[in-house]
Amino acid sequence: MTSLKTKVIHGGISTDRTTGAVSVPIYQTSTYKQNGLGQPKEYEYSRSGNPTRHALEELIADLEGGVQGFAFSSGLAGIHAVLSLFSAGDHIILADDVYGGTFRLVDKVLTKTGIIYDLVDLSNLEDLKAAFKAETKAVYFETPSNPLLKVLDIKEISSIAKAHNALTLVDNTFATPYLQQPIALGADIVLHSATKYLGGHSDVVAGLVTTNSNELAIEIGFLQNSIGAVLGPQDSWLVQRGIKTLAPRMEAHSANAQKIAEFLEASQAVSKVYYPGLVNHEGHEIAKKQMTAFGGMISFELTDENAVKNFVENLRYFTLAESLGGVESLIEVPAVMTHASIPKELREEIGIKDGLIRLSVGVEALEDLLTDLKEALEKE
């Protein structure tokens, strides 16, 4: 079996079929010449298909063990297309600490179409079992989750969902296929914000989806073409180029994050650290079972919640910005940034405190990052 280190470089369509170019070219075209009336070639119109996008779609399917991949103009565009599989009256079980943008899409947009949902703590499998209704069609979650780094048991949740004839939809953005393989653990559909680790350089907005079901692939393909939120050829090329270095990047992100999490845990200025690589993390054993490393995301709380503003503004290498997964380190406060769309009462109920801080640990020199954090904590 080919190693993922090799697959990220040689997987999917890694060379151009027409010219043999070792980097698939950017086919910057909207339409394609046909052989004659009623005689289209493989591609007709770039909303329906484009060679550069197709190469990326084949690659994500290969990396995740899917039968077909789909590239969208953003992660949320991909989520929207997948959730459009469901109809009025259908019920979706949604992880309670899901990304704010996903929550907003479901709560403010999809409910208008008649879809219903419940937020459930999926780390409690009994709560999950109790949440199923006759109308339940899917369970949707991230693992590790954003921003609380909750680790959910993909195999167990998938098994429970299958017993209720429901699909398992896993957002694998934080782990990437390099660290975690949801389809192999029972998931039906895997989603990514490729803006993050897959692109890896904070220079592209993209979404990727894959499935292990030929039937679902046909439906998702229809929705991708019908909704039309497809990824352009230039952005497709950028994501494919980013994926080529996914292996060394994820190893570096994970190694740096582990040391930084341990540093924060030992600091008197920090009251709590959320990182799956710490042995006292609630999901540590599950993470060890289903991940090959623990990733580059850390969340934590300061002992003095009033010191958050000064802390985040006194860092040199951790840039205050939304998003994550680039080679550079970023810092944000979810309650006022990425998760502001979730009502305050609900945020507090699920544990996203106003003072929670999230780090996207980059691949810079570890000693520089540690010094930066140490000095900022001391300036509080």
Swiss-Prot record:
Is the Lyase keyword given for this protein?
yes
- Chief localization class? cytoplasm
CDD domains, per this entry?
CGS_like
Q: Name one GO cellular component term.
A: cytoplasm
Necessary cofactors: pyridoxal 5'-phosphate
Function of the protein: The enzymatic degradation of amino acids in cheese is believed to generate aroma compounds and therefore to be essential for flavor development. Cystathionine beta-lyase (CBL) can convert cystathionine to homocysteine but is also able to catalyze an alpha, gamma elimination. With methionine as a substrate, it produces volatile sulfur compounds which are important for flavor formation in Gouda cheese.
Q: What is its EC number?
A: 4.4.1.13
Keyword line: Amino-acid biosynthesis, Cytoplasm, Lyase, Methionine biosynthesis, Pyridoxal phosphate
Report the Pfam families cross-referenced here: Cys_Met_Meta_PP (PF01053)
Query: One MF term from GO for this chain?
Result: cystathionine gamma-lyase activity
Catalytically driven reaction(s)? L,L-cystathionine + H2O = L-homocysteine + pyruvate + NH4(+); an S-substituted L-cysteine + H2O = a thiol + pyruvate + NH4(+)
The entry's protein name is Cystathionine beta-lyase
PANTHER family recorded: CYSTATHIONINE GAMMA-LYASE (PTHR11808:SF15), TRANS-SULFURATION ENZYME FAMILY MEMBER (PTHR11808)
